[in-house]
Amino acid sequence: MMKLTCVLIIAVLFLTACQLTTAETRDEYRAVRSSDEVRNSRSTRDCSGSGYGCKNTPCCDGLTCRGPHQGPICL
């Protein structure tokens, strides 16, 4: 039983590696897309996007910080 489990785990790892190396674009493989989304998440960006607060973080290019002093947002 343990041999079968090991063979299955190795097969799954091999198939996953094949999908990663043969995908033509990153959009084809979900795990790559997910890691990119985490990397580009709001907490790791240097600027605030449209609709996000800009009190402590500057707005991204092309956006302007507007609104009341207590809670301005990027527009």
UniProtKB/Swiss-Prot annotation:
One of its GO terms (molecular function) is toxin activity. Disulfide bonds join 47-60, 54-65, 59-74. Residues 24-45 form a propeptide. One of its GO terms (cellular component) is extracellular region. It is found in: Secreted. Pfam families: Conotoxin (PF02950). Expressed by the venom duct. InterPro entries: Conotoxin (IPR004214). Residues 31-45 have a biased composition (Basic and acidic residues). Residues 31-50 are annotated as: Disordered. Keywords: Disulfide bond, Knottin, Neurotoxin, Secreted, Signal, Toxin. Residues 1-23 form the signal peptide. The presence of a 'disulfide through disulfide knot' structurally defines this protein as a knottin. The cysteine framework is VI/VII (C-C-CC-C-C). Belongs to the conotoxin O1 superfamily. This is Conotoxin VnMKLT2-012. It comes from Conus ventricosus (Mediterranean cone).
